[in-house]
UniProtKB/Swiss-Prot annotation:
The protein's assembly and partners: NDH-1 is composed of 14 different subunits. Subunits NuoA, H, J, K, L, M, N constitute the membrane sector of the complex.
One Gene Ontology term of the molecular function aspect: quinone binding
Catalyzed reaction equations: a quinone + NADH + 5 H(+)(in) = a quinol + NAD(+) + 4 H(+)(out)
Annotated compartments: Cell inner membrane
Record flagged with keyword Cell membrane: yes
Pfam family, one: Proton_antipo_M
Main location: membrane
Protein name stated in the entry: NADH-quinone oxidoreductase subunit N
GO biological process entries: ATP synthesis coupled electron transport
Record-stated family: Belongs to the complex I subunit 2 family.
Transmembrane segments: 4-24, 34-54, 78-98, 103-123, 128-148, 163-183, 205-225, 239-259, 272-292, 301-321, 333-353, 381-401, 410-430, 464-484
Record membrane topology: Multi-pass membrane protein
NCBIfam families named in the record: NDH_I_N
Protein species of origin: Aliarcobacter butzleri (strain RM4018)
Amino acid sequence: MSQFLYLVPTLTILVGALVLMFMSMYDKFNIKNHIFASSVFLIIALLFALSNVSNSFSVQPYESFLNNVLTFDSFSNFFNILLIAGTLLTLLIGEHYFQHRSYFKGEFFSILLFALFGMMVLAQANELITAFIALEIASFSIYIMVGYNSDDSKRVEAIFKYLVLGSFIGAFYLLGMVLVYGATTSTNLADVSTFIATANQQDMILVYIGLTLILFTFLFKIAAFPFQSWLLDVYRGAPMIITAYMASTFKIAIFSFFLRVILDYISPIIDFWDTILSVVIILTLVFGTWLAVTQQIVKRMLAASSIVHTGYLLLAFIALGYKDGHLINIDSAYAVMFYLIAYLLSALGAFGLASHIISETNVKVTFDDFKGLAKQRPFLAAMMTIFLLSLAGIPSTIGFIGKIYVFTEAIASGYTLLTVIAILATIVSVYYYFRLIAVMYFYPAPDNCETEEFDDKRVSTYAIMFVAILTVLGGIGSAIVFFIPAMNIDTLINFSQVAVQSLFIR
């Protein structure tokens, strides 16, 4: 019974998806009803997940319940909380956007919860087949949401490109899984880990090749070089709020499984991947920076910059290191976890606020559309500035703390050159992020615009404001709100440490 309780957050989301699917069959339920129902299920699931936080350093493998294909521990619960919170914030931030797009129907919100269900299962997956099924549930839900408005040719092109490339790269995962099974006679990660620890180098060839093919699948999903070609077109073609969801929450789900596999099961392969990941990191940082600098559409600029943030996260991964049978720098795993929190808030806030601004229009969201925003809507301009400062890694924001954490651990592991390149990419990022800030504050507003006072009572505005507050408190929380533990930077870091350390308790 206790094992079942740990599944309640995931099952709540699944039940919610099914209920919303049936609700969509009846015309009497409007968009507001679907948003409300979705929010209720998400809040219930979040409360159940938060209730499990007290079970720190716990590992509950479902050996008798689900044949050990899922694992519950503080690590998976950490990601459950992030994924549910990210989905809930996406829903609330996009509330105004959803209501002003007639093509959004009730079944869309069911698909959104199915995507979350797949992500949560992925975060708890303890077996390669289970992980693949969870990944595909989430991915196909995302495909549908990307191309939800079939009347828009850009979205049709985006979903076709994403679907074809995603299906193609999924074959790499399957091939890699077959090779791993051929070598180890198992797809359970615990069995694969045992084989890696005891086998000689000659027997490891198939395992290395198979796991590398699986690595390519995840590099595609997080849009690392050279698998980033789909990102700009797909992000541009997708509805703005779905772009926000893909750039933040979905990316976190991918990293959740990737990090679990590296830390808990196949850490020796980090040494084998060292050269591959080093090259990928350099090219991801350089190419992502070049793309971001050359964009004229804000949506594409933010999309390109997300490639750069992928490079930062991969830098923290490679900094884990492996020598003499153990990880060299476990603190780097804490850096990954903290940076994921920082990136979730910053990226979701920036993309979500852009969707909020254009919710009543159909513009492409170029830099010109933000001219004089500080005069037109000063409150929204201030919040966008906070998110951009955090993405750029400017002090007093959570993004700054995250970057410092990642760069410090990378240097400690001996990756000084990669860190220097990452710092240079950060310096260049100041240009394209501050370019948007300059447009908002130093360019004249259109002649026909009127200044709006802060009397916006929409749910979206308050949700964005909440994320902006967290972004600032995550950067200076220890200094100004030390008496509120939940707002303390050290609390977030400790939460990350507990999540990682639970993987090593058996």
